Amino acid sequence: YDAQGETFCALDHAALIWEQGHSIAIMGESGSGKSTLARLMIGLERPSEGRILINGVDTTKWSLREWRKYRGKIQAVFQDAGGTLNPAWSTSKNVEEALVNLTDLSPSQRKNRIAELMEQTGLSKNLLDTPVRRLSGGEQRRLALLRSLSISPEFLILDEVTAGLDLISTEAVLQLLEKYEQEHDCAYLVITHDLQIASRLCEVIYEIEHGKITKKAVR
């Protein structure tokens, strides 16, 4: 993209392997290209040049219908979770909207699914009817995680998902992610500055610098 009249390459031949059931982490300094890579993978941004290959398919040529089918399998939780939620809707409606669009669950099944995940993410059931704009930043991030997990994705991008959470909330989120991965064979792409979190959740850790993958470590 262009910055102050100069062309800046956010990513340059950043290739990595991410397979179902195998979680990976991306670590690097701010501005290294971590979040840009995640947003490109889920179609929230388009590359100015080059291609994005997922299972050998160039997603830059996908139609809106193809992206919708893909998003039933992959979800993302970004650090600014509030930007992906409707602030005027209640917590339950934000989650139920995803369940209506991307699952075949009945109304009663949707209600039970939301209640179950509210408990697992440490969100009080008293917040079910609370507008999202009245939630704290940490509560919004846990709600975004809850919504993503509710549709049982095969792949989940986690962009600094525990940043700013207290120790108790962080541990609750990590335990939930570990349990979900084991039960559903889900693969995470974890973007974090915390090596302990990366090592706990992931088998492979990539380091990115100036838009390029520079290191790879296998746990």
What is the role of each PLM region?
Residues M27-E29:
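The feature captures the beta-strand-to-loop junction immediately N-terminal to the Walker
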Residues G50-D58:
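Conserved ABC transporter NBD signature motif
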Residues T59-Q75, K93, N101:
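ABC ATPase NBD coupling module
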Residues D80, A88-N101:
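Q-loop/switch helix immediately C-terminal to the Walker
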Residues Q109-N126:
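Conserved ABC ATPase "signature" region
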Residues P131-L135, E139:
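Conserved ABC ATPase signature
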